Amino acid sequence: MCGCVGVISNVDENFQVKTIVTMSDIDYEALEKEVPLDDIDFSDLEEQYAVKPDFGIDNFVVVDGAPIAPEAKVPVLIKVLKKLFSTVGEIVEGEEGIHMPLEDGKSKGFLFIQFKTAQMADAAIQQMHGKKLDQKHRLLVNKLSDIEKYGIEGNVPTEFKEPEIPPFKSHGYLKSWLQDEQGRDQIGLHYSDTFGVYWNKRKSPEPVIEPRKGFTSKYAKFSPKGTYLFSIHPQGIQSWGGAQFESISKFIHSQVRLIDFSPNEKYLVTLSPQPIQVPENPAERASYPFGPESNGHKLVIWDLATSEPARTFALPPHLEGQKEMPWPLVKWSHDDKYCARQGPGALAIYETPSFQLLDKKLVKIDDIVDFEWAPAPVYLDTSSQNGPGEHVLSYWTPESSNQTARVALMQIPSRQVLRTINLFQVSDCKMHWQDEAKYLCVKVDRHTKSGKTIFSNLEFFKVTERDIPVEKLELKEVVINFAWEPRSDRFVTISRLDDGALNPAIPKNTIAFYAPETSKTKGGAITSSKYKAFETVVDKHSNTVYWSPKGRFVVIATLARSNGELEFYDCTYEEENVRTTSKNNVKLLKSEKFSGMTNLAWDPSGRFVAAWSSSWIHTIENGYKMFEFTGNMLRDESIDNFNEFLWRPRPPSMLNAADRKKVRKNLRTYSAQFEEADAMEADAATRQLILTRRKQLEEWRAYRAKHASAGHQKKEDKMTVIEEIKEEIIEEKEEIVE
C-alpha cells in the first residue's frame, strides 16, 4: 500500500507559525508491527477520561408505610430502617443512601433508599415488601422507576382497553378411545427412550399414533379415568390427550420426581426435591406460575382445568432429606371435595377448591402414624340410602407409655369419631378399605411379650351396620398381603409363619381364600357370620394378589424373584352337572412361569392380564406377556430395555341395572360377534371366508326383498263344516248273568 505525507503551515493564536505533518493511506498494520503498543502505558489517559458509573433510578426503592415521626426522632428511625434493609443489600454511604422527606417538623411516612446495584434493589422488594415493622406499620417497597413509570400522568392510559383473548383451541374429544367399535382398550409401551400408545389386539398391538422418541425423561402416567396422559421433563409436566395425543397443558415445576391425581381428575399433585425459587427478574417473574408465598416449597397441587397452581406446601421437617419418600403425601376423598396431609401429631384437612383448612384449624391426633379415606361414599346406619353418603376416614396411633394403640373412624366435616378400637402389643397396622366402603379391614401385626415372634390379627369394621360392629380374625401367621375382591365381602391373604427360618429358597407362604359363613333364618333371610377360609394353598413363593376389576378371577403372583410365577384362580367355579348353593368354590385354572417378572396389571374390562419385566429393576427377560383371564397366553414380547407397560383406565360404566341385565341376557349373541372378530383377526383366509359369506347373505336378502311381491297369492281354502257325533262313555259296568 502506498501512502503520502503532507506539510501544512498554520498560525496559532499568538501568530506563531506551526508546521503540522499529516499522513493518509498509511499502512497501519505495518506501523503496529514496528511500534509495540503493549509497552505503552495508558493508565494516565484511562484515569483522566474514566466515566463514572451512572447509578440510575433502578438502584432506588421507595418505602411507604413507615412511621410518621417528629424531626428529632427521624435519625433514630433512619438508623433502624437502615439496619433492616442492610440485611438484603449494601446501601450507599452518606446522606445519599437514605432520604426521608420532612414536612411541618415531622416525617411524611415514606423514604428513599439507594442501593449500590439494581439487583440489591430487586432483592429488597422481594424480601421486604409487605413486611411488618410493628403491629401498626407494614412496609410497602417499590422501585423508583416503577413510580415514575406508573405515577406520571399520561404514562398509564385512563381508558379501559379490552384484553385480547386468544382464540379457543380444541383438542378434540378427550374420551374418543371409548368410541372404538370393537370396544378395545389402549396400552402404553415404554422402551429405551421411546413411548407409544397402541390398541390392544389378541395377535399384536396396533399403533394409535407413531411411537415418539424422547416423549418423557422419566416415566409416563395416565390419569385415573384415562382422560389425560402425562409425561415428565426437567422443566415440569406435560399433559396430552385427544385422538392424536396432542399437547394440552404444561405445568412448570423443575425436576419433578413424583406425581399423583385426585380420583375425579380435577387436581394434579407434583413433588420435586428442588425448592421453588421465584425469579428476581420482573419479566421472568411475570410468566412464572408461583408467587413469593411459594418460595422454598416443594409440593404443588395444580388445577387441571386451568393448569394453574391451586396450593403449594413445604415438606414437613421430618420428611426433609429422606431418600425414600412416602407417597402420596396428599390423600383425597372419593369425590375430590376434601384432601388431607399428615403432619406431626395432626391432620391438615382442606376443602376444595379454596384449599383452606377445614374450619381454619388442624385436626389434632397425637402421634398419628397413617390415615386413609374411604374410597366411596359411606352409608351409615343413620344415613339416608338415597343421599350422597358420608365422607369418612380411618387412622391409627401407636402404643405409648400411658395408652394403647388405637384405630378410629372419623366423619368429615363434623370430625365426629364414629368408632374406636384399642389394640395391644402392636408392631404395625395397615388399613384396607373395600372398594364400596362397606368394610374396613385393619391388618394388625402384633408381637409376643418377648418381642421375638410376629403374628397378625384382622379387624373388620362393618361400616354400614348399626353401631359399626368389629369382627376379629386371629391368625398364627404374619399376613404379608391382603386384597378385597371388588364389590364383594370376600378376600385373599398371603401369610407365612414367623419361625425365624428365613431361607428364601424354601416355599413357606400360604394362600388363603376367605368369605363369611352364611346361614338362612326361618324366614328365609340370609345372615353372615364370622369369616372363614374356604380354601388354602400351602408351601408357595407367591407374594402378591391381583383381583380382576370385575371380581371372581384372581391372579396370585410371585414378583421380583428369579422364579416368577402367575397362578390364575376362579373363585366361583361351577363344575358341570354338579349343583351347589355355595359360590365359594376355588379352581386353579392355569399356572405360568415368568422369570424376572416385576409387575402385573389387569385391563379395565377384566379380560386380559399383562405381566412384564422392567429394565429399571433388572435386565432379566425384559419385555411383557399378555394373558387371558383364564391364563391362556396370547403374546410373549421380548423387548430390549423395556421399561413399563400401561393400561389406559376407563371411567365407570354409565349403564344402569336394566342395561346391564339386557347385556347379560344377550351375552351369547355378543360373544359370537366377538369370536367372529377374533377369528377374522387371527387368520387372513378365515377373514376372507367370513367376508364372502356376509356378502352372499346380503345379496340373498336383497334378492328376496326385491322379488317378494312377485310371488303368487295363496288361494283361500274352502272349508266345509261336517256334522260329527261323538260318543263318550261315562261309566262302564260289567254284570255276570247266570
UniProtKB/Swiss-Prot annotation:
Keyword Chaperone: no
InterPro entries documented for this protein: EIF3B, eIF3B_RRM, Nucleotide-bd_a/b_plait_sf, RBD_domain_sf, RRM_dom, TIF_beta_prop-like, WD40/YVTN_repeat-like_dom_sf
Principal subcellular localization: cytoplasm
UniProt region (Sufficient for interaction with HCR1 and TIF32), positions on chain: 1-120
Keywords: Cytoplasm, Initiation factor, Protein biosynthesis, Repeat, RNA-binding, WD repeat
GO molecular function per UniProt: identical protein binding; RNA binding; translation initiation factor activity; translation initiation factor binding
SUPFAM superfamilies: DPP6 N-terminal domain-like, RNA-binding domain, RBD
Keyword RNA-binding found: yes
GO cellular component terms, A-Z: cytoplasmic stress granule; eukaryotic 43S preinitiation complex; eukaryotic 48S preinitiation complex; eukaryotic translation initiation factor 3 complex, eIF3e; eukaryotic translation initiation factor 3 complex, eIF3m; multi-eIF complex
GO biological-process terms attached to the record: formation of cytoplasmic translation initiation complex
Disulfide bonds: none
UniProt WD repeat ranges: 211-250, 322-360, 363-406, 537-579
Pfam families listed in its UniProt record: eIF2A (PF08662), RRM_1 (PF00076)
Domain RRM positions: 59-146
Localization (cell): Cytoplasm
Annotated region (Sufficient for interaction with PIC8), positions in chain: 1-245
CDD domains: RRM_eIF3B (cd12278)
Protein origin, superkingdom: Eukaryota
Functional summary from the UniProt entry: RNA-binding component of the eukaryotic translation initiation factor 3 (eIF-3) complex, which is involved in protein synthesis of a specialized repertoire of mRNAs and, together with other initiation factors, stimulates binding of mRNA and methionyl-tRNAi to the 40S ribosome. The eIF-3 complex specifically targets and initiates translation of a subset of mRNAs involved in cell proliferation.
Family (UniProt): Belongs to the eIF-3 subunit B family.
Subunit description: Component of the eukaryotic translation initiation factor 3 (eIF-3) complex.
Protein name stated in the entry: Eukaryotic translation initiation factor 3 subunit B
